[in-house]
Every structure is written in C-alpha cells, then in structure tokens.
Amino acid sequence: MQAFRQRIRQTVPEMRRVKQIHFVGIGGAGMGGIAEVLLNEGYQVTGSDIAESAVTSRLISLGAKISFSHHAENIEGASVVVVSSAIKGDNIEVITAHEKRIPVIQRAQMLAEIMRFRHGIAIAGTHGKTTTTAMVAMIYAQAGLDPTFVNGGLVKSAGTNAYLGCSRYLIAEADESDASFLHLQPMVSVVTNIEPEHMETYHGDFEEMKQTYVNFLRNLPFYGLSVMCADDPVLMELSSQVGRQVVTYGFSDEADYRIEDYQQTGFQGHYTVVAPNGERIDVLLNVPGKHNALNATAALTVAKEEGIENEAILTALAEFQGAGRRFDQLGQFIRPNGKVMLVDDYGHHPTEVNVTIQAARQGWENKRIVMIFQPHRYSRTRDLFDDFVQVLSQVDVLIMLDVYAAGEQAIAGADSRSLCRSIRNLGKVDPILVSDHKQLAEIVDQVIQDGDLILAQGAGNVSKLSRELALAWGKE
C-alpha cells in the first residue's frame, strides 16, 4: 500500500482572505478531520472542546491551538468559526462570533468548500459509510491517485481519519444526522442504506428524511454518478426520483454489481462480484460479515465506474485493515477462566449491532458471545426499544451499562434498567446491569469462559472501557 505522507500546502486562493479558522467542538472525528486537512493546507487552526482526546492531541501535534473550555476570547483573530452539530446557538463563542460579525458555518459547509474545486466522492447512509469511505480512500491510494480524504473514523492503514493528498480527488463521509450533507456538491455520491435515525432532524417524519436523501443525490451534476445498494428497498423506491445516472450493487439479483458465493472463514470473507459486462471479480476481505462485503462492493463499484484497474481495487481490499472501532480486535487474553478474544465495535443502532453479532457468530463458531453493551442516547433507546430487546437477546451473556446520554436528559422507560427488564422477560438471556464502571472488570471475569468472544458495543465511552480492560489484562 502506498505510504501516506503529510505535506504542507499553500492556502487555496479562493479562501485567501481567510487566515485563521476556529472550530467549536474540535474534538469530534468529523471536525478534527477537516481541521487536519486545513492545517496541512497552511491555515492557522484554533479550536475549543470540553475535554482532551486522541483527536485533539493529534491536532495539537500538527500545530493547532486548542482550549479545553468555551470562552469568548478563544475566537480572537478568527476569520471564520466552524461549529459541530453538537454545539448550540447559546454557546459563548458562537454568540461572540455573531457579535463581531465573524461568519459562523456548519462543519459540512467547510467540507463543501474543500470539495468545491476537487472531484468529490461523498459516501452517505445510515450504516456502513465510515468503512466504505475508508475502503474507497484505500483503493484510490493503491491506484496511485493520492486522494484527500475526510472520514468519520480512523482509517487504520493511514493512521488518521483525514489526509491531504496531491490529486484532485476528495473522498468524504457525508453526514445525514443534521442534514448538513446537503451542502456538498460531489461528482459521485454513494448511499449505503436508509433507516429511520436522527429523526429529530427530520421532525419525526421518515418521508422527509427520504426526500432529503433525494435532494442530496440531486446535488450531483447531470453527468454525475449515484451509487446505491440494491438490497435496500427504500433506496430502490427512491432511485427513479434522483434524475441522475444510478448504478447499484448488492446481493440482489437486480444489482448491477452483484455479489455471489459469499463465504466467511474465521474473520475473513471471500466472494465474487459479477460486473454489468459479465466480468467475474473474486474479492478477499480481512474484515468479517456480509455487511462488509456490501461496503467493499460499494467501494469497488465506485472504483470500477471511475476506471480504476482491478489489481489496485483487489489489493486495497485484501490489505484493508478496517476502520477505527469497527469490529476492532483488541487481542486475545489469558484470564483465570481461560483464553478470550476482546473486540471493540462502534455499532449502536439495532441493525448495526445485529450484523456485528452475525459476523461474530460466523467467525467464532460454537463459541459464546459475551456483549458489553452501552446504549447511546435516551431518544434512540426509546425510539428503537423493541428492536434493541430482540437484537440484544441473541447474545449468550449480556452486560448492560447505563445509557450514554450524549447531552440528553433521561427519558422515563428508556433507560438501561427498563431495557434489561424487557430483555429478561423475553426469556433468552438474563442481562447483568452494571452502573458502576469500576465493577466492570470484576464482573467480566466472573462470567467469561474459555473461548469466549467479548464484544464491547456502543458509541459512548464503552470503547475507552474496553481498552482499559485490554491494558489491564495484557495481551497473550
């Protein structure tokens, strides 16, 4: 795989009046990725957040000045202020920027400016977009095209979630959570799937959400390309409304790029893609699950349609190490009750949790799955409560952490205790509720057996907890 090299660029002439860019909420993966690209383009970058993180540490090492509190003076000297979707209008830095007539823009608006004079490839969808974005970036890098990319998660092969390349290609994850992906005007758009999620943005109306995706796809020029998963009935319903060229992929017999003969051996997948011209392409993946075969085939479809040779595509996919926190194997560990495997996964929607469990079942046959699950947001737990009950009942042992609020107020009946009660009533698994994280390591040791696969699942700080376990246990 081509090595990734960071280079300092000159600022683009189109933003020549912009000298200093301030990010409010700079520690988010999406915000940090854009900040990193701008740092490498030569801009002065400042930012603020409430806590240090791996993202902020990396940005500081690259020259960003970051404050870990929100104060009016933090925006001193800023030409523009970029805000994450988590930042409210009453933030003191946002208020001060308005008072000083400094432009305040959304993260996606800045991404759109970076994309404006490049050949943009935007990957959207409820599930799989981070992994698909990483796969597309790796394919273009393997082909020697040196793309710029901005992803919502770590691209392991590159050691970062953002990179400034020399070529005209920009590959970016497109965020539907606040509908800000409507700012983007790419040449190629990918939509992996559409499910009801972030419904507060869409006023609880799935029809509004679907129309927003159509509008996103209509941002393509008339000669642009829309890539859609043929397995998703919602996407197929919308495909005729886009008014742009549509190419499909998936397991469906109707897919233009059709997946056949998928098999999983351990955590490795292999299958064949039948292209529109009848060409048969054998694919090897070192990430498990049919969902990853779909992600890889989306990336393959983009690359084939843009004229990239099979050798680069297949090499990149075979060497793909995964995206950060997507079935992230932390290692095998010897515990008092035997040897176990610990995996960290970001999935926090029932569909995502389900495909992770299925991939683990295929790769860890005849072994128990012990899940440490942390619900993310009370609103999501409420809206998808019954789905969570069904999906979480599939594991052999369930350790339930309290809901990670992500700034939300508690909602009656949508807490972890209520979830445990309903799962217990279903009668398939008896959940263990752990409210004190200090007790987690002891409880895990009590329930595990030799050969178990431990899945630390969720979008909150369960990842940090799983890594603390790994550090305390030491690798085999």
From Swiss-Prot:
Residues binding ATP: 125-131
Bilayer-spanning residue ranges: none
Localization of this protein: Cytoplasm
Matches recorded under InterPro entries: Mur-like_cat_sf, Mur_ligase_C, Mur_ligase_C_dom_sf, Mur_ligase_cen, Mur_ligase_N, MurCDEF_pg_biosynth, UDP-N-AcMur_Ala_ligase_MurC
Pathway note: Cell wall biogenesis; peptidoglycan biosynthesis
Molecular function GO terms recorded: ATP binding; UDP-N-acetylmuramate-L-alanine ligase activity
Protein keywords: ATP-binding, Cell cycle, Cell division, Cell shape, Cell wall biogenesis/degradation, Cytoplasm, Ligase, Nucleotide-binding, Peptidoglycan synthesis
Statement: the UniProt record of this protein carries the keyword Cell wall biogenesis/degradation: yes
Known catalytic reactions: UDP-N-acetyl-alpha-D-muramate + L-alanine + ATP = UDP-N-acetyl-alpha-D-muramoyl-L-alanine + ADP + phosphate + H(+)
GO biological process: cell division; cell wall organization; peptidoglycan biosynthetic process; regulation of cell shape
EC number from the UniProt entry: 6.3.2.8
UniProt feature coiled coil, ranges: none
A GO-annotated cellular component: cytoplasm
Family membership noted in the UniProt record: Belongs to the MurCDEF family.
Function of the molecule: Cell wall formation.
PANTHER family, per database record: UDP-N-ACETYLMURAMATE--L-ALANINE LIGASE, UDP-N-ACETYLMURAMATE--L-ALANINE LIGASE-RELATED
UniProt xrefs under NCBIfam families: murC
UniProt-recorded name of the protein: UDP-N-acetylmuramate--L-alanine ligase
Organism of this sequence: Histophilus somni (strain 129Pt) (Haemophilus somnus)
Organism placement in taxonomy: Bacteria, Pseudomonadati, Pseudomonadota, Gammaproteobacteria, Pasteurellales
This protein's encoding gene: murC
